Amino acid sequence: MKKILAFLLAAYSMIFLACTTTSFTVHESEPTTLSKAETFAITVPNDYPDESKSGITTSLELQKVLAGCGVNASLLNRFPDYKSVTAETKEKYDYIVEPTITYWEDNIATWSGKSDKLLLVITIYKTKTSEVMDTFTIDAKSSSIFFGANDPVDLIKEPASVHYGKIIK
């Protein structure tokens, strides 16, 4: 009886762990080092179609991630991308962080068994030269049958924290 209970417990644990992991595929550019002493601003991308507030929540999550790396980043609410940022605004910052939402799937029903999905490309530009300093892509999926992520934005923190923790000194 103890063996059966141990087996059932082990089987349940393996199934539960397999069903609650989140998978990330990360594509990073060549490593570069950015200084947390310099000034950063984050553009607010356009919302993904039919996903209200996806742009602002993405930028706010990146702002939290950068704060965890010791960077006080401002949000540029009026600018959806680097090209739209005015020269006057660029003069105030050393780097502009541009998130681009390529795919966003928010499966609202937690118990539906459907995963939240996100494909996000984050580019950091040096404002003085418009040079791309870093490009980082997060391709993430919550694979929980039982407990989905609350929102695709929840899939940003872990891979972004690891990446920016390595390059911001």
Across the structure, where does each feature detected by a protein language model lie?
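A structural "domain/chain start" motif
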Residues: F16-V71, G165-K169
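A short beta-strand-loop structural module common to alpha/beta enzyme folds
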Residues: N72-F79
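Positively charged n-region of N-terminal signal peptides that target proteins for export
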Residues: M1-I4
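Structural motif
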Residues: A11, T32, E88-E91
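Second-shell loop/turn segments in exported
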Residues: N46-S52, A109-T110, S144-N150
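C-terminal/domain-edge helix-coil "capping" segments
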Residues: C19-E38, K126-K169
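Bacterial N-terminal signal peptides
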Residues: L8-F16
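Surface-exposed short loop/turn segments
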Residues: T20-T22, D81-M133, S143-F146
